[in-house]
Amino acid sequence: MNEAAARDIAEWRYPEEYSMYDFSGYEEEEKQLFNGLHFPVYEKEIGEFALVGFVSVGPAAQVVGRSSRKIYEDESATDIGLGLRPDLCGQGKGLGLRLVELAVAFVKSEFPDDNVRLTVAAQHKRAVKVYERAAFVKTEEFRKMMPGVNGKKRPCRFVVMILK
């Protein structure tokens, strides 16, 4: 992750129901963009390459908490996390699916024997549908307190999915 991409990603703002994915105001999360486990994704737009998303791999893609710790002890799977630029979400152009396929291809090239696992907030049905289209299946669920609007924590249900 280079500094310019990290700065751009840190400024992305999602609609309120997806705001848990904003980096803004969470300096620790912003620093994590430089931990070597986050990769910017560029796509050619109007003749030049533009930042369209990012992929996180391994521990950077896990939603760790008391109720999920056991799930991530299974080291036969490599975790992926995905972030699509907010203005590109929900447009029906298949960008989310392309990002998932890119992440899976990367993990499979680096760790061919590993399963591929991801974790998504259950209420984000649009993302769950994309992952299902990419051949992921739900395997487990857990709850974790997450930052909400105005910094108030709220319970959130997460779904763990494995690539078939």
Where do the language-model regions lie?
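A generic structural micro-feature
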Residues: 71-76, 151-157
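Acetyl-CoA-dependent GNAT
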Residues: 3, 7, 11-91, 97-100, ...
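Short aromatic/hydrophobic contact patches that present stacked aromatics
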Residues: 81, 117-119, 160
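Short hydrophobic/aromatic beta-strand or adjacent loop that forms the aromatic wall/cage
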Residues: 36-38, 154-161
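Conserved active-site alpha-helix within GNAT-family acetyltransferase domains
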Residues: 97, 122-140
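Short, solvent-exposed loop/turn elements at beta->coil junctions and helix N-caps
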Residues: 25-29, 142-149
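Conserved beta-strand-loop-alpha-helix junction that forms the acyl-donor binding cleft
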Residues: 112, 117-128, 144-156
